[in-house]
Amino acid sequence: SGRHLCHAMLLPRADAQALLPQFEREGKLERNGASIQRRGKAAVVTQSNPRFLNAEDQTSLDGAEICVDLALLDPATEIAVMRGAVVEHQKYQGRHVFGAGINLTHLYEGRSPFLWYLGRDLGPVNKLYRGLARPESPPEQDSIEKPWIAVVDGFAIGGHCQMLLAIDL
């Protein structure tokens, strides 16, 4: 059913749970498309697709969701921060950009499957808003939540603007 799907998509990913001990020890982790670093009691998640102005696509979504999960699962983290990495584009070179939404190059080339949108909206974006579900109870009754702050350098277009609506501050 729809409720079961929504609940399942809010559960922490198995690969994030497997990486949690490493993140707890080292305080940082890099994945394809994102990284996470603990700074004091804050976890900073940085979305990174520098060639495409940090646009979201099939290659960056998994890494971003893993980092969101880690920020929510980490017992030493009390607040989470989302930002974009430094980009390569000539006009913005050397500057952080929050994100350009969906990767329009991949969309044009037909490399953005329809189900990607569902996975993005029910996965990492929903987790920013609702937190992580627990397997034994519905998320509206018991979830792992932390406040999120967005650091918006440059711009947030399309899906990145949508992401801002799910973030607390």
Segments and roles (model prediction):
Residues 150-161:
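Gly/Ser-rich catalytic serine loop of serine hydrolases
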Residues 154, 167-169:
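Gly/Pro- and small hydrophobic-enriched strand-loop and loop-to-helix capping segments
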Residues 52-55, 98, 155:
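Short N-terminal micro-motifs specific to bacterial/archaeal maturation
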Residues 40, 45-46, 63-133, 137-144, ...:
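A structural preference for short, pocket-lining loop segments at secondary-structure junctions
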Residues 2-87, 92:
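Conserved CoA-thioester-binding segment of acyl-CoA-metabolizing enzymes
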